[in-house]
Amino acid sequence: MKGEFMANGPPDVDLIITGDRVIDPSSGLDGPAQIHVTNGKIVSLSDDLPLQSASRHIDATGMIVCPGLIDMHVHVYEWVTNFGLPADDAGVNSGATTIIDQGSAGPWTVGGLKAYVADPAITDVRCFVSANVAGALMGGMEGIVLHNPGMMRIDAIVNSALDYPGFVVGIKSHGEAGGISHWGTEVLEMAVKAAEESKLPLYVHTGELFPVDEQNRPVPASLMERVLPLLRPGDTVAHVYSNMPDGIMGPGDEVPAVVRDAYASGIHFDIGYGINFSYRIARSMMEADILPNTIGSDVHADFNCYHDDSKLDYSMCGAITRLCALGMPLADVISRATLNPARILGEE
């Protein structure tokens, strides 16, 4: 994992970074420290090496120094999907050293994502493979044709995890009004089964995405009662601060009991920032002690803004800034952007 901190390392270092605020969630450090780098890797933290013992010194006084940010939600299958960004624009150029593409590639197309996007990138790119075989080639309303039960192959999902270990690190599915109005929870149930067989976590989009069959529109207040009980501890739901009436919060002003229960059970909540963030909903959820476990930016091309009360920039650092503005301590936010996702990826 790029940006990794190791507890102790050899005394010979190539680079010393000195900072008056170094935040390392894995050790609990939040204060002045030296960072020692050898062969491009951080090997130790201390404050007692002479600066002349390294060939290079960076003075990071007045800056925040932390492990590389891990963005749990991006879309970077450029030229194959109609909403993919260049990987390094979503990654290192935006402050994230590791990014997780969420469902742009399916089991039949994931090889191209690795060969033509991940491998050439400076950024460490991983993916949650789409539950449908082709992936999310078309975003928004047009994409529904790809996400019906006939496009699901559990064996293909499992094989993609076996073929690309360490790159395919999870499965992406949907628990939203459009798909459920057409097929109920069948697609999500198949995704859960694939996740169980492949021993991978599931990441689930919430909030309306695909066209709704109005004759079968799910009741917004009870939609999450159909979705969340299907998930397992360690799975993740996205867009937890969305203002969509059929999102996590529902149409009311109180956090539903099923949401509280899911959070308490160990289901992870990801901010899924992008076009699905509302300060109003965020405040309500935070007042109920529902805080995001991870911070995904959901950066992708061609945004249409559906949020109700804020103009957003769609970046990992933008999401971090908003959470700090809502009162979360910076060290806590950094932990949710580094240590927590590293644990989900099994790379703590």
What are these regions (language model features)?
Residues C66, Y116-F128, A194-K199, A262:
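Alpha-helix-loop-beta-strand connector modules within alpha/beta enzyme cores
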Residues D71-F83, M141-M152, G179, E214-N216:
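Active-site mouth loops of central-metabolism enzymes
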Residues Q52, D59-P120:
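Metal-associated gating/positioning segment near the N- to mid-region
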Residues D20, I35, G40, G62, ...:
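Divalent metal-coordination and catalytic microenvironments
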Residues F5-C66:
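Histidine-rich, glycine-flanked metal-binding segment
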Residues G112, M152-F269, N276-N293:
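Histidine/acidic residue-rich metal-binding segments in metalloenzymes
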Residues S94-I100, S104-A105, P120-P149, K172-G179:
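Metal-cofactor-binding active-site regions of metalloenzymes
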